[in-house]
Design a protein with these regions (language model features):
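Hydrophobic positions on the alpha1 helix immediately C-terminal to the Walker A/P-loop
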Residues: 23, 27
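Hydrophobic anchor at the beta1->P-loop junction of P-loop NTPases
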Residues: 12
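Conserved substrate/cofactor phosphate-moiety recognition/catalytic segment
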Residues: 29-68
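Conserved lysine of the Walker
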Residues: 20
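Glycine-rich phosphate-binding loop used to anchor ATP phosphates in small-molecule kinases
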Residues: 54-118
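NTP-dependent small-molecule kinase module
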Residues: 134-195
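P-loop (Walker A) phosphate-binding loop of NTP-binding proteins
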Residues: 15
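A glycine- and Lys/Arg-enriched "phosphate-lid" helix/loop adjacent to the NTP-binding pocket
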Residues: 90-159
């Protein structure tokens, strides 16, 4: 069973609207441990309105915010909604699509390599089909997400799957088109720690 004495640092990964925030909150409540929510960037609405103009600023802000969260959780344990690894996925997709200049991508790469970024003990990857992610994003209808291109969402899902297949850390992949209960997820995480 998870206890605060264990100081476990668990990251929840997945594309936009995969269900990360919901699961992160459920696990935090289930185990009564700290939760670092995904930061809401002051650039978010601007970014979705004009990817090219705001991509670099958005990505630098998100990396800095996530590192701050990882430093806290590496010391005290808890759950992190989206990990810094995922910032690299977003940056590559933006560069591949021409929404981030190569020099900005290289600057993000340099910054990423330079940051002190404690790693989660385990990352839970919520794998969804592109159509699931797109539908969930539409269903939640967040004002700041208006303007997300479906092609961008599809590209992100493919990039996440590639990342997961190459990830060298501890990864538990959950097929999240049909979410499990928090108890079922907690059982899988506890089983990971017991082995």
């Amino acid at each position: 069973m998870y206890t605060t004495n264990n100081r476990r640092y668990i990251g929840i990964a997945g594309t936009i609207a995969a269900g990360k925030s919901t699961l992160a909150k459920q696990l935090s409540d289930y185990w009564h441990v700290p939760l670092i929510k995904e930061p809401i960037s002051p650039y978010l609405a601007d970014f979705y309105a004009d990817n090219k103009e705001y991509a670099f600023r958005m990505q630098v802000y998100m990396m800095a915010s996530r590192v701050k969260g990882s430093l806290i959780l590496s010391r005290f344990g808890g759950i992190q909604d989206r990990t810094i690894y995922e910032d690299r996925i977003f940056q590559k997709v933006l560069c591949d699509r021409g929404d981030m200049e190569q020099r900005d991508y290289e600057t993000c790469s340099l910054l990423y390599k330079s940051l002190s970024k404690p790693s989660p003990d385990v990352v839970i990857y919520l794998k969804v089909k592109p159509e699931t992610s797109i539908q969930r994003q539409k269903d939640r209808a967040r004002v700041k997400e208006i303007g997300i291109d479906e092609g961008y969402m599809e590209h992100l899902v493919m990039a996440y799957n590639t990342w997961a297949s190459q990830f060298t850390g501890n990864l538990i992949t959950l097929h999240w088109d049909n979410p499990l209960s928090v108890e079922e997820v907690a059982e899988q995480i506890e089983s990971f720690y017991d082995n």
